[in-house]
Amino acid sequence: MAEKGVKQKGELKTARIPIKIVPVDTPLRKPEWIRVKAGNSAGRFGEIKSMLREKKLHTVCEEAACPNIGECFGRGTATFMILGDICTRRCPFCDVGHGQPLPPNPNEPAELADSVSSLKLQYVVITSVDRDDLRDGGAQHFVDVVRAVREASPKTTIETLVPDFRGRMDIAIDILGNGLPDVLNHNMETVPRLYKQARPGADYAHSLALMKQFKARYPDVKTKSGLMVGLGETDEEILEVMRDLRANDVEMLTIGQYLAPSGHHLPVSRYVHPDTFKMFEEEAKKMGFSGAACAPMVRSSYWADQQAHSAGVA
């Protein structure tokens, strides 16, 4: 058994997943529409990175090797990752490390809230690794962080991007009510046919139920979910997931292109043309989503502030 606090990445992380990754001899060449803006150490990008190091805070932007980190940090926005940087799951599309996490840092809520206030962030996204080792899946820590940010920076709009709280959903939903965000996001990630391959340990119906039950309990909070394309799904399967999301009262949507972090992760099965993303966005509007961001470089938290504004949140 791995030692607590030791992070497994790449091949070590994915060695024990149920459906093994089959490496490709020649990865698909990235098309011209996949373009990433590099970060500049000056200005807001450098300011945010410096404060993250000073406060020993984590962002999913860095831990998951998000391609938009330069643009988002440069705009003065970041997605904070709470509850450590070691995940109890082994999802083979994700670059976050796996292992036995350390106990939650009791100082993290205050330190994160102080950073949000100091950086004068108008919109903050708070996410976490999966914490299957905790009785509540980390729900109370989410509440503590939300409350601390509300107190330190009352005008900041808060989006939480939560895990699935597997095996403890009812407890988690009860607890989350003690510190509600403005937007609750939980990513479906992919289509149900690919769950065992891409999301070992997760369950499609459970994730839908989490969002439906949360919305039923807290109807004033907007609900949101995100999908990736390029894992082996079809366009029709994506549309079917979108229908399922609407049937379970999810109001906001993001769809973006999957990019493999390394050769030890799931390979990209296809690069979806921007016109197809436009089709997804048009269909989302027809289905009644209040906000939909669908484009190759879109990620769950990418321009989340503008999407929330268009949905009447911020």
UniProtKB/Swiss-Prot annotation:
EC numbers: 2.8.1.8
Protein family (similarity comment): Belongs to the radical SAM superfamily. Lipoyl synthase family.
Amino-acid positions noted as binding [4Fe-4S] cluster 2 in the UniProt annotation, renumbered to this chain: C87, C91, C94
Pathway named in the protein's UniProt entry: Protein modification; protein lipoylation via endogenous pathway; protein N(6)-(lipoyl)lysine from octanoyl-[acyl-carrier-protein]: step 2/2
Superkingdom of origin organism: Bacteria
NCBIfam families found in the cross-reference section: lipA, PRK05481.1, PRK12928.1
Binding site for [4Fe-4S] cluster 1: C61, C66, C72, S301
Enzyme class (EC, first level): transferase
Catalytic reaction list: [[Fe-S] cluster scaffold protein carrying a second [4Fe-4S](2+) cluster] + N(6)-octanoyl-L-lysyl-[protein] + 2 oxidized [2Fe-2S]-[ferredoxin] + 2 S-adenosyl-L-methionine + 4 H(+) = [[Fe-S] cluster scaffold protein] + N(6)-[(R)-dihydrolipoyl]-L-lysyl-[protein] + 4 Fe(3+) + 2 hydrogen sulfide + 2 5'-deoxyadenosine + 2 L-methionine + 2 reduced [2Fe-2S]-[ferredoxin]
Cellular component terms per the entry's GO annotation: cytoplasm
Species lineage: Bacteria, Pseudomonadati, Pseudomonadota, Betaproteobacteria, Rhodocyclales
Annotated Pfam families: Radical_SAM (PF04055)
Cofactor: [4Fe-4S] cluster
SMART domains: Elp3
Name listed for the protein in its UniProt record: Lipoyl synthase
Keywords (A to Z) from UniProt: 4Fe-4S, Cytoplasm, Iron, Iron-sulfur, Metal-binding, S-adenosyl-L-methionine, Transferase
Domain Radical SAM core: 73-290
This protein's encoding gene: lipA
Keyword Signal (UniProt): no
Location within or outside the cell: Cytoplasm
Cofactor note: Binds 2 [4Fe-4S] clusters per subunit. One cluster is coordinated with 3 cysteines and an exchangeable S-adenosyl-L-methionine.
GO function term, MF aspect, one: lipoate synthase activity
Transferase recorded as keyword: yes
Source organism (scientific name): Dechloromonas aromatica (strain RCB)
Main location: cytoplasm
